[in-house]
Structures are given as structure tokens and as C-alpha cells.
């Protein structure tokens, strides 16, 4: 059984903390003008990791919210994984040098697999691949375009690359609170040996309990965004459920 991690999401647009609906920048809902304060709140609530995305960077292909990310890194001691606009080695080096614990490579994983392999070789345990899918096909450039590559195909390309994790997002469910796409996420987790983190659609504590069912043992965790901001998920309740499940498994081992 993989240790399950629940990642609170901070999506950055123009320096603010927002949530999108199915990746549509025109449907950005602002939840906080102070991402660093939001990060500190998540850390105080007991979360062990943060998931941060530079949305403007994902569209631009280069970091666009550096000041906000810097402020988040200064505000918390827990590890931060960061994605959005990471398409060059100097960007990887820059963020890791500033204290980001893990960088997520998305578009470049489709366009330039050798870049991912080289980054994983140079920075073991620090590189994740973001696989964002629409109808099973991988989307790129801030989800603005869809490739011909399937999620399973892309995951298998990095099977022996030393990638630390895959973050799998079902775009159709992202920000609409329809529940995680467990079947598709599990299919990917079964196709690769890389730890897979589920994203997109997590809506309630029921989704957390579903994640903790025995058939989801391959999954390494999930990312929660809108449900957390909307108050649909109580952080203490969610984290306590994960602790109880892991204690029960430990007792039964």
C-alpha cells in the first residue's frame, strides 16, 4: 500500500489564488489575493505537501508568477510541488534551487521526452510528470490543445526514467466537483510502476473514503482544490480519515 497524500491546490493567476472550471482561464474564480497566506493556512491545517500551479506560466511556456511562488516558499516549511511553464532545464534548476521540492513537467513531457529523462537523471526524486487528459488524450499548453497521445502511452514512456510521480488530471472533471475519475486513474496506475496521484473532480469526503478503498491501493494520493475552498471538505476530517485508514492497514499488516 502506498502512503496516501492529500495535496491542497494553489492555482496562481496574475498573482492571485484561483480555481478554474475545466481549465478555462475565462472562468477563474478568485479565492484569495494572498497565496502565501493561503499556503500557510494549509500548512497549519496539517497538510504535508502543497500542490502549486502557475496557470499563466502554463499558457506562456515560462514562469509568470515567480513572486507569488517565492512568497509561498517563504511562508511554509512543508514541501511544495510546482507545475506550469516548466519547459527548460534552467527553469527546473531555478525552482529547485529556490526550495521547490518537486517540479511537474507537463507539455514538455509530450513534446520533449528527452528533457524529462535528463531532468530526472540530474535531479533524482525531484521530477514529476503531469498528464492532463481530455477523453483519454493528453492535453498540452495549459490544456488549450489536445495531442494524439493517450495517458497510458505517455506514462509508459517514462517507466524507466526515474520520474518520482505522475499527476493525472481528468480535465472534464476539474473544478466541477463531479468526483475523481477512479477507473481512468487506476488504469494508468496499473500500466506503470510510477506512483500516480489523482486530480480533477474531488468533491467530498466520500471521494477521500473511495481513495482509501483496497482497490485504490496503487494510488499515491489526490489533489483537492475547489472542494477545499468551498468548504465541501473539512481538512481535519479528511486528514483524520487518511490517518485512520493507514493505522488500520498497519495493524493488519
UniProtKB/Swiss-Prot annotation:
Into which EC class is this enzyme placed? isomerase
What keywords are annotated for this sequence in UniProt? Amino-acid biosynthesis, Cytoplasm, Histidine biosynthesis, Isomerase
Q: What is its main location?
A: cytoplasm
GO terms, molecular function:
1-(5-phosphoribosyl)-5-[(5-phosphoribosylamino)methylideneamino]imidazole-4-carboxamide isomerase activity
Q: What are the positions of the active site?
A: 11, 132
Is this entry keyworded Cytoplasm? yes
**What catalytic activity does the UniProt entry give for this protein?**
1-(5-phospho-beta-D-ribosyl)-5-[(5-phospho-beta-D-ribosylamino)methylideneamino]imidazole-4-carboxamide = 5-[(5-phospho-1-deoxy-D-ribulos-1-ylimino)methylamino]-1-(5-phospho-beta-D-ribosyl)imidazole-4-carboxamide
Would you say which domain of life the source belongs to?
Bacteria
The UniProt entry's GO CC annotations, sorted and at most eight, read: cytoplasm
Subcellular location(s): the record lists:
Cytoplasm
Asked if the Swiss-Prot or TrEMBL record annotates the protein with the keyword Isomerase, the reply is yes
Instruction: Give the family this protein belongs to, as stated in its UniProt record.
Output: Belongs to the HisA/HisF family.
What is the designated name of this protein? Answer: 1-(5-phosphoribosyl)-5-[(5-phosphoribosylamino)methylideneamino] imidazole-4-carboxamide isomerase
Gene name of this polypeptide: hisA
